[in-house]
């Protein structure tokens, strides 16, 4: 593994590459959040025959903080991704997005129309805030009454204190990561979540959307993306199975896999199944 920094207009961007000497089309991994960070666990294993690149978006993980929180916008993250691809000299690349990283990947294809992106892998895909909100409301309605009450009162009063946070964690244990306990690296990643980025772009939790992405919706635009697409979700994923199926049907050239007994972070809950699915898609690419 080699790591370094890329100088961009917004600041220094951290990156790492595994399998740099391999010959197949490189993977570039786009992490979720916004404000989360790259987690190589499980994903770096794809470096058997191809380079796998990770980078932390500005304001996240090991990259610089933006000097002004107004920097955090879809447009700037798309431009940043464009800079990263050019600086890493990835003439051909397969984009691999996780959650928000899927929205970023598709926004990049729609806005920049790059010639070098040969395929995209969308894991636990977030592509539409209205559809995301619909799925979360359906999940919340099935939670215990005390959890529903804490969430509803928190959202109504704008009080995201202890009761709301406790309810949020119960929801996360069911729909974000169902491992018990959570791996140390996942706990550490959540502790390093940049709340300024997350609140600015998203909101106080996965199901309360109040930031700049509140009206984000790529669903009507998906037919314009013509490269091969793989969509992956867990059977209890925040990205609901029916919604992901709708995404698949919207893309001209897409396939979909549902991982059993898995939620949003299905790549660490069911790593063997996840790797079989992705490796099959990557054959001859």
Feature annotation, model-predicted:
Residues 152-227:
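Alpha/beta-hydrolase
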